[in-house]
């Protein structure tokens, strides 16, 4: 049935997004499914309510749904079916096989959701939270790709195309001025070099030639912080440990003026292939992109001996990601999953800090959970080797007033980002520096 095809395509898009392979828009517009509008809407909506669905699926009577033969092991397809059942237009137009996945358990699904609602965690609560988020206007951040042109050339070209360049914002009135932006206005960001700001609701901005041809790279401001704070010198070597889709790799290469080398590793071969395409389109000439498991990588290998800088942006819950079209890919991740992520993140960071020539590493997540942020930093700093060789850099970007949680000693030395406070995705950054130079 046609609706089954839609549901299966949405499930694949959700899988890609949660695996950090593609953004929702890139996945939708790269799909062969013709009705892009329906595809985009259902993908965004299913992702938005995913935290509720995840909690429902934790119920002991409903866990078996994940093994239902009719969904072929796709929990992402379950998200779509549950969205249509609990929020959307129902399952009236899909096949009997897909309907049965929900219909055989519908009473228990509703019981669990109602119990969640009584505690303020159900569908209604999510809708109310979403109404609040709609009032937050996150602008479109675009990084000038200095591998293709200079910042001056970019600004002059924007002016010739009738954009109004309003200059550099001041940090103290950033939010006030950004929320008043008109669609033809452009600001220069006060924190991140070569980052400019457009109004949040510009239509078809992805099709603008500067964006399509990657003269401007659409990248959330918070996501620009890792490479910006790493600040690798031209001619140096960087290791991007979990690199796909390559945004931070391309940013590092731009800062390095395409001089030196960036080792860009990721576990998934298809993500590496996509990353290579994006890096090529961005004119990155110094990236060595390859598939591999960083935890199984011999960081003492001679070929990595000149690596002085590392970007550690490991898999995370994605709880900070708030996209346009009300697309929320994160949420209240269950504690068991957070604990597993925390352990993985700490292992990856500790392994990166064992690069023998390393001078500086930036750890980042697009998560709001302290388990993945301050707790990881705390745990890593307790490691004997790390404690003897590294310190957490203090006074990082002092003009950035939104810091880590005060309940942790490391908090004041870390950066946090939040849609309501910084007008960005939720994010966390910490900078580690070697106590003594390895040179």
From Swiss-Prot:
List keywords of the entry alphabetically. Methyltransferase, RNA-binding, rRNA processing, S-adenosyl-L-methionine, Transferase
One annotated GO biological process: negative regulation of cellular response to heat
Q: Which reaction does it catalyse?
A: a cytidine in 26S rRNA + S-adenosyl-L-methionine = a 5-methylcytidine in 26S rRNA + S-adenosyl-L-homocysteine + H(+)
SUPFAM superfamilies in the cross-refs? S-adenosyl-L-methionine-dependent methyltransferases
Query: Null phenotype?
Result: RNAi-mediated knockdown increases lifespan and stress resistance. RNAi-mediated knockdown results in a higher frequency of gene products that arise as a consequence of increased ribosomal frameshifting in response to osmotic stress induced by high salt concentrations in adults. RNAi-mediated knockdown does not result in fertility defects.
PROSITE patterns given for it?
Answer: SAM_MT_RSMB_NOP
GO MF assignments: RNA binding; rRNA (cytosine-C5-)-methyltransferase activity
Q: Which Gene3D superfamilies match?
A: Sun protein, domain 3 (3.30.70.1170), Vaccinia Virus protein VP39 (3.40.50.150)
Entry binding sites for S-adenosyl-L-methionine? 266, 293, 313
Reported EC number(s) for this entry are 2.1.1.-
Q: Where is the active site?
A: 366 (nucleophile)
Q: Which GO terms describe its cellular component?
A: nucleolus
Q: Which InterPro entries match?
A: MeTrfase_RsmB-F_NOP2_cat (IPR049560), MeTrfase_RsmB-F_NOP2_dom (IPR001678), NSUN5_7_fdxn-like (IPR049561), NSUN5_RCM1_N (IPR048889), RCMT (IPR023267), SAM-dependent_MTases_sf (IPR029063)
Q: What does this protein do?
A: S-adenosyl-L-methionine-dependent methyltransferase which methylates the carbon-5 position of cytosine 2381 to 5-methylcytosine (m5C2381) in 26S rRNA. Plays a role in the production of mature 5S, 5.8S, 18S and 26S rRNAs and promotes the processing of the internally transcribed spacer 2 (ITS2), which separates the 5.8S and 26S rRNAs on large pre-rRNA precursors. May play a role in the translation of leucine and proline codons. May play a role in maintaining ribosomal frameshifting in response to osmotic stress. Not required for global translation.
PANTHER family cross-referenced by the UniProt entry: 28S RRNA (CYTOSINE-C(5))-METHYLTRANSFERASE (PTHR22807:SF4), NOP2 YEAST -RELATED NOL1/NOP2/FMU SUN DOMAIN-CONTAINING (PTHR22807)
Can you tell me which family this protein belongs to? Belongs to the class I-like SAM-binding methyltransferase superfamily. RsmB/NOP family.
* Stated name of the protein: 26S rRNA (cytosine-C(5))-methyltransferase nsun-5
Q: Upper lineage ranks?
A: Eukaryota, Metazoa, Ecdysozoa, Nematoda, Chromadorea
